[in-house]
């Protein structure tokens, strides 16, 4: 894959990135919001006057409060789930206890998904399982090899494609994610049906 393909953006990403940046800055508030320069300019206002007005405008963070109130309401009563035949399964219990392989349980991860969806209007959730050379299910259980969740915010998922299976269903066959970017480098992951 060449540099041009890696820099390509999905048309929906291009259409929404300014909104997503506004939403997260509104949620974070403070200097993040001020630095977005979202105040409307007055018709005859000079750039210096506008900068001074932005600098002296108080930024009360009501967006964060609203998201947190809704989140606390939704998660006040823990969800109940029916796992059917999987109830009590070792790998399921391990997943529920550490859903993201960073020590956070499933409810905590899903609470973050809900908060991101409240901020951005959507978010991406990837469920993956490490590739291994184990030969049996018992070996996987012994090594705690199991699925895990990764949460991606929409500004980091820059390109994707859905294909139609022979059954008629759509499935994701291509995904480009920016994991980290700074002045010196960018870490970009490309997911296809064949490889990551």
Name the predicted role of every residue range.
Residues 1-160, 164-166:
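Extended, helix-rich architectural segments
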Residues 81-84, 172, 178, 192-193:
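Intrinsic disorder/low-complexity signal
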Residues 109-111, 169-176:
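Short, hydrophobic/aromatic-rich segments at coil-to-beta transitions
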Residues 128, 178-180:
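Structured loops at beta-to-helix junctions and adjacent beta-edge loops in soluble globular domains
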Residues 164-167, 171, 181-183:
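Helix-boundary and N-terminal cytosolic regulatory elements
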Residues 185-196:
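Long, internal scaffold/assembly segments composed of regular secondary structure
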